[in-house]
Amino acid sequence: MKKTLLSLLLTFFALCSYAQVDLSYYLPSGYTYDEAIPTPKEILGYEVGEWHVSHDQLVMYMKAVAEASDRVTFEETGRTYEKRPQVMLTISSPANLAKIGQIKADRKKLRDAGASVDIAKMPIVMFMGYSVHGNEPSGANASLLAAYHFAAAKEIAGDLDNMVLLLDPAINPDGLNRFASWVNTHKSYNMNGDPNNAEFNEAWPRGRTNHYWFDLNRDWLPVQHPESRNRVRVFQEWLPNIHLDFHEMGTNSSFFFQPGVPARNHPLTPLKNYELTKKIGTYHAKALDQIGSMYYSEEDFDDYYYGKGSTYPDVQGSIGILFEQASSRGHLQESVNGMLSFPFTIRNQFTANLSSFQAAKDMRQELNQFMKDFYKDIQKEVDSDVNKAYIFGSKEDDARSYHLADLILQHDIKVFSLNDDITVNGKEFQKENSYIVPADQPQYRLIKAMFETRNTFKDSLFYDISAWTYPMAFNLDYMALNSQILNLASVNEITKSSVDLAPGKVIGTAGAYQYAMEWTDYYAPKAAYKLMEADFQVRVATNEFSTADGKVYGRGTLLIGKGESGLDDQAFFNKLVEIAKESTVDIYGLTSGYTGGVNLGSPNMMHLEKPEIALLVEGGVDSYEAGEMCLN
């Protein structure tokens, strides 16, 4: 009995010891820290890794560091769906912080093949993005240590004269907070590492995704969510040389750093990118060796799909680096390698952060020169490419064309609208809803990645998707243009602020016989729901018909009457104007029911009823699919 009790006590104290770490467990030796900079514990009330930091606590600490240090500025870059702030620390020498605008302007010259820039004096920029997957929290918790170290370590003051660090502590604030709430709620002071523990089995939909249960690490290219648009804007403003992306993987694994599988690099990414990534990897290996952590590289993960945080930089002269840490999924969990503690996972991520800093410091000129050469080489590729531009559009739907143009603009790519209609190889592109993207611009490789149709590959296996031709995804007509056709086009450059969807309108007058709305527009379903919500009678044509002015209305056209709304002609008309404007669709007044094809009173006009939708969640429901339904 005494032996059993002793064994239980030893196990208890061993488990407790995993959680009893202080700042010295994480911080490297040989540094002295400015006492004016608050430690995480002084602000949060607990040591890093003792609890999972919530997003509000994370922001609170970042603000405290910025207020205490002349090396750090705090910036809110946007808001999530749940109105949490997306924040970023800019860390550099006070002299650099005083001339941020000039540093950004100089970096833009790296994209200009003809611009002169002094590489020897240019600071290197490193972006550090943590926990885009909210339930991979070692990254966000390591950002506490990174903020403290880079703000307080006295020995790096001189290094910051030549460096700018951009620290985004939580790329997915909503998901991170969801997960922190779960694991902190289920934490026991007497920790149990059994994988069956509730702490490690979070409730649906889990914290990986954002508010609408979307994987934000697949949104760097499509930029469909505010979190993505905000961070892509930061990327395009700064053009970082190194872009760190902190993740987690299965509990029984170790630690991964890029490069990934060599055969699965995207062909548009130059070989030099892989070579530099591998060179930086030697810094990670050395640092992880020093703390005795296991690791691997060049397996499992790849650098193909440009919509991920570690590959989006690769097509823009930057070095994207993925880190994958075996996940404790809570505070302490059994693994095939022994007990895996949350503090251990945080320490590995922070160590890789420090090794990246050292690589950036040592390779500053080399990486700035690489970016400059990257864009110089692009000009040679542009000159040899027979495709000088891409044109896309839809005669039936302004909205889809607009949304693709808007997407492309987010990536610092020039887009032009047409002044006149143009016909290319028998295909007409109308000036109202067509756009041209010239190839001869710095983002040539990214443009090519968006528009090309690639169907031959070195490897038959992929970590992610292998094709993403954007005009096809938007169901648009598109073509590549040669120089002769491009020179014939009359165009105007558009900007984020100048391009917008035109409001819809009602073409006709109050008191029309009926009103018609075509189903070809992207926002037609939105308008249809609003019409039924207003108690209007809505019918759908199952055969086409035509009016006296020769206009043909296809299958799927909606016919709209007052129904049971109780409105007079003018009030009914005014409501239609409101719905058309809000939904950006056009509604047409019809003067007679005697139409070509089927008449408006035909049995082929089927009545629609407003749908009452029940969305199933939890259980066996895929959260990605459910989230997509919620968003739409």
Predicted segments, located by residue:
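Aromatic- and acidic-residue-enriched carbohydrate-binding clefts of CAZyme catalytic domains
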Residues: P195-F214
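Bacterial Sec-dependent N-terminal signal peptides
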Residues: M1-L23
